[in-house]
């Protein structure tokens, strides 16, 4: 598939290509995402359910919704969305991630449309979705505004985008770079570039410039004793997640 690479940072892609086989190893190089996934999913599902008036306790609550997981990796978010009944497209510019994602979905009995493509290429193809999951991606792209604008164009009017990233401050440098990559060695050194992190105010401004309406944001806070993540209304100092609507 031809991919428009306007916002793709090839050096960032190479990092994740090298780790592709480990996506579904909860003790491997993607352990931080496995630990974070429950709180990410809680936020995502509640926001989508609220936007579309869905009851999460009902069978297949997202049936009839078309959801894009951009930068899908091995499918850690795409698979739960499919289990909730959504029609899911998983897109990744790192082609090496996709065989892992496809194989795991097949073994799990899930139908997910995984594609080696980019946000810009999907826009050019005229694709649109009820929701776009844009989780831990924006800090890896070459042009955040162009990328977020493409993501906005992929939303149907009234659609919702969930976007998570890392704040840029001394605490995030200490925890996400020094702690995670050098001390705890949860991630390979160089996985993140602290200079590409975005403060909540910076991300809000970019979302607005892209034509989106930010409606919610929460911090995601890690407790090293319990090894669990939780949502916070106040602490957005390291990881945080936002919800934005494309105006109808």
UniProtKB/Swiss-Prot annotation:
This is Ubiquinone biosynthesis O-methyltransferase. InterPro entries: SAM-dependent_MTases_sf, UbiG_MeTrfase. Its EC number is 2.1.1.222, 2.1.1.64. GO terms for biological process: methylation. It catalyses: a 3-demethylubiquinol + S-adenosyl-L-methionine = a ubiquinol + S-adenosyl-L-homocysteine + H(+); a 3-(all-trans-polyprenyl)benzene-1,2-diol + S-adenosyl-L-methionine = a 2-methoxy-6-(all-trans-polyprenyl)phenol + S-adenosyl-L-homocysteine + H(+). GO terms for molecular function: 2-polyprenyl-6-hydroxyphenol methylase activity; 3-demethylubiquinol 3-O-methyltransferase activity; polyprenyldihydroxybenzoate methyltransferase activity. Belongs to the methyltransferase superfamily. UbiG/COQ3 family. O-methyltransferase that catalyzes the 2 O-methylation steps in the ubiquinone biosynthetic pathway. It is an enzyme of class 2 (transferase). Transmembrane segments: none annotated. Gene3D superfamilies: Vaccinia Virus protein VP39 (3.40.50.150). Pfam families: Methyltransf_23. CDD domains: AdoMet_MTases. The lineage of its organism: Bacteria, Pseudomonadati, Pseudomonadota, Alphaproteobacteria, Rhodobacterales. Keywords: Methyltransferase, S-adenosyl-L-methionine, Transferase, Ubiquinone biosynthesis. S-adenosyl-L-methionine binds at residues 40, 71, 92, 135. Pathway: Cofactor biosynthesis; ubiquinone biosynthesis.
């Amino acid at each position: 598939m031809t991919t428009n690479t306007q916002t793709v940072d090839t050096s960032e892609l190479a990092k994740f290509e090298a780790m592709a086989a480990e996506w579904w190893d909860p003790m491997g190089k993607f352990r931080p995402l496995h630990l974070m996934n429950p709180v990410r999913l809680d936020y995502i599902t509640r926001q989508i359910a609220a936007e579309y008036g869905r009851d999460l306790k009902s069978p297949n609550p997202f049936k009839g919704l078309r959801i894009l997981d951009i930068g899908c990796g091995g499918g850690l978010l795409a698979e739960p969305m499919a289990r909730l009944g959504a029609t899911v497209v998983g897109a990744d510019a790192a082609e090496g991630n996709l065989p892992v994602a496809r194989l795991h979905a097949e073994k799990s009995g899930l139908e997910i449309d995984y594609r080696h493509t980019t946000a810009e290429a999907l826009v050019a193809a005229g694709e649109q979705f009820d929701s776009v999951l844009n989780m831990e991606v924006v800090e890896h792209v070459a042009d955040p505004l162009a990328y977020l604008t493409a993501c906005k164009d992929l939303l149907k009017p009234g659609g919702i985008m969930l976007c998570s990233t890392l704040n840029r401050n001394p605490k995030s440098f200490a925890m996400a770079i020094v702690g995670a990559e050098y001390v705890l060695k949860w991630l390979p050194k160089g996985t993140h570039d602290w200079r590409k992190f975005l403060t909540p105010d910076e991300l809000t401004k970019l979302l607005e410039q892209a034509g989106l309406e930010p409606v919610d944001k929460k911090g995601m806070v890690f407790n090293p004793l319990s090894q669990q993540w939780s949502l916070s209304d106040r602490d957005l100092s390291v990881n945080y997640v936002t919800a934005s609507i494309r105006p109808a």
